[in-house]
Amino acid sequence: MVEERKPHINVGTIGHVDHGKTTLTAALTTVLAKRLSGEGNKSVKYDEIDKAPEEKARGITISTAHVEYETENRHYAHVDCPGHADYIKNMITGAAQMDAAILVVSATDGAMPQTREHILLAKQVGVKDIVVWMNKCDVVDDEEMLSLVEMEIRELLSKYGYPGDDIDVVRGSAVKALEEETGSGVWSEKIMELMNALEKISLPTREKDKPFLMSIEDVFSIPGRGTVVTGRIERGVIRVGDKIEIVGLRDIQSTVCTGVEMFHKALDAGEAGDNAGILLRGIKKEDVERGQVLSAPGQIHSYKKFKAEVYILKKEEGGRHTPFFSNYQPQFYVRTTDVTGSIKLPEGVEMVMPGDNISIEVSLDKPVAIDKGLRFAIREGGRTVGSGIITEILE
């Protein structure tokens, strides 16, 4: 009997420094632990979240706190980053994916520069849904002031392509909710209201339900059987007998999967998340190479030019010591391979300093299989100097 698991959704708190993201994270876990049973519901204190351990993602060190909570219908994994730079790095590297974000805005300040920056980044990196928590409403007794702040947030969300008029805005106070020790009371109810808003968000399509895609890491020739490519299946399912394409670096080749292997066992199929070997019909070892992808027919194409949002590492993070200018030519590590390319900076931007995040245009030397939302590393001589996400395919 397989235990039915609750559908899972990844959320995170975003917003300006000191608007209460971490306090809200603590309040969410605390109120839910008191209100709802469920082994995922444990109260997490502010200090535990604030002293988040550092972790490495794509060669970049990021402090991120991970907490979890659940309702009757869903299980939530929630990320909160202590520092503003950590947010930018987290969103660009995808260290902690977010299906949805809780935008925290202080009722006393309204929208601030980082509020805007986080909304824009959320849009760029493909966060589909946002709900708003207007915090510190206990210290604003002017109803008109609250309405103005709410209106301003809605307009800002619309400006960046979110449905500002329809998004749920919950007015509350994370501090007051934490003070209500029983988990019931007017401010705790606001936390439950926020949870109800999260419950309405549509669940993300699981990777397994998308068309098949696998990045090729290695190629072997097995005498008497043919050519096997290995790699991690990124999305979808592959079955023996499926038609597939080999895309990137060269012209597209069509073939058929004649075998799927994992841990030296032959299987009927492989699915998203599996590290598998795929046997290819009629393909010679020299016809395929690391850096190409296997894909369901017609699902992915190779391109050389794209726009991206990137974060450039600081010197202390092991990045460059000096700025770079337009036409800088590093390697772009895309899926499983390094490809040289050149960077064009936006008009009016002379140079990029270590520690900056910026929108750029990239022209690669060779076409590779890419799609919008794909993350990559920028490398120089094998070390990571930056990280990025593709926001638009050009050609």
Swiss-Prot record:
Q: Which reaction does it catalyse?
A: GTP + H2O = GDP + phosphate + H(+)
Enzyme Commission (EC) number: 3.6.5.3
- Top-rank lineage group of the source organism: Bacteria
Q: Which GO terms describe its molecular function?
A: GTP binding; GTPase activity; guanosine tetraphosphate binding; translation elongation factor activity
Which residues lie within the region annotated G4? 135-138
What's in the keyword line of the UniProt record? Cytoplasm, Elongation factor, GTP-binding, Hydrolase, Magnesium, Metal-binding, Nucleotide-binding, Protein biosynthesis
In what residue span(s) does the tr-type G domain sit? 6-205
- The record's region (G5) falls at 173-175
Per UniProt, GTP binds at 15-22, 80-84, 135-138
What compartments host this protein?
Cytoplasm
Its cellular-component GO annotations read: cytosol
Report if keyword Nuclease is assigned.
no
Q: Which PROSITE patterns match?
A: G_TR_1 (PS00301), G_TR_2 (PS51722)
Binding-site positions, Mg(2+)? T22
Q: Does the keyword Nucleotide-binding apply?
A: yes
Q: Where is this region: G3?
A: 80-83
List the residue ranges of the region (G2): 59-63
Q: Which Pfam families match?
A: GTP_EFTU, GTP_EFTU_D2, GTP_EFTU_D3
Recorded hits in InterPro entries, A to Z, give: EF-Tu_GTP-bd, EF-Tu_GTPase, EFTu-like_2, EFTU_2, G_TR_CS, P-loop_NTPase, Small_GTP-bd, T_Tr_GTP-bd_dom
Q: What family is reported?
A: Belongs to the TRAFAC class translation factor GTPase superfamily. Classic translation factor GTPase family. EF-Tu/EF-1A subfamily.
Self-association state and partner proteins as the record states: Monomer.
Supply the PANTHER family for this chain.
ELONGATION FACTOR TU, MITOCHONDRIAL, ELONGATION FACTOR TU-RELATED
Function recorded in the entry: GTP hydrolase that promotes the GTP-dependent binding of aminoacyl-tRNA to the A-site of ribosomes during protein biosynthesis.
HAMAP family named among the record's database cross-references: EF_Tu_B
The name under which this protein is listed is: Elongation factor Tu
Q: Which organism is it from?
A: Ehrlichia chaffeensis (strain ATCC CRL-10679 / Arkansas)
